[in-house]
Amino acid sequence: METFNSLFMVSPLLLGVLFFVAMLAGFIDSIAGGGGLLTIPALMAAGMSPANALATNKLQACGGSISATIYFIRRKVVSLSDQKLNIAMTFVGSMSGALLVQYVQADVLRQILPILVICIGLYFLLMPKLGEEDRQRRMYGLPFALIAGGCVGFYDGFFGPAAGSFYALAFVTLCGFNLAKATAHAKLLNATSNIGGLLLFILGGKVIWATGFVMLVGQFLGARMGSRLVLSKGQKLIRPMIVIVSAVMSAKLLYDSHGQEILHWLGMN
């Protein structure tokens, strides 16, 4: 048992719980993003340090995003050849963000991110026709790659929460993709930025590999189930999921940043 605990950093029971948490997170993440809301707190609750939890989370997240990407490529929803520039810019952006976060505090992002996530949820809620079908494309080539790949990729490497929603929003608003197609392409760039960020964590020696790989399998399975629903249900499923996940994520981010003030204001502290 001591050997098991030293290898996985958690007990067998907790490892089983983490596997199913990762599966659920992969399912949610493949549809609307936000799976890290489940996995990062779960890893920290299991006793990992914040650094180990973030690094191991990035490893297991690769399982879900890669699983979804493979599914969408095989269904010919996503073409790798058409996304080469976006992939390259996303990789560079995520590596840059992951490198910078080691030297710069992300406090400013923690303050403004809840507002941005709320705006995403409201955007999809108040524009019910958005993403129902393909529309005229507004941006091509390098400009789009810099915004969707470089900027969002940098954000994903630097901070991360809701990156999948930002990718999907870029494909809907700038490329004119329908919501299902945008979600599929978002997973490709999400997988790219996950890999880029993971490489930096590997160099830092913070990844708990055994636990991460077990969760990666759970993520892979959950994301495969979610990806099938994306193509079969389309925007009827994706839109409400994005709105719900955005609301939950905003609430959690606000609580993480201002939990004591909120409790005091409610008279609970």
From Swiss-Prot:
Cytoplasmic face of the membrane: 29-30, 106-111, 178-197
Annotated transmembrane regions: 8-28, 31-51, 85-105, 112-132, 157-177, 198-218
Lineage top rank: taxon: Bacteria
InterPro entries: TM_pro_TauE-like, TSUP
Entry's localization field: Cell inner membrane
Chief location bin: membrane
Family (UniProt): Belongs to the 4-toluene sulfonate uptake permease (TSUP) (TC 2.A.102) family.
Record protein name field: Probable membrane transporter protein YfcA
Organism: Escherichia coli (strain K12)
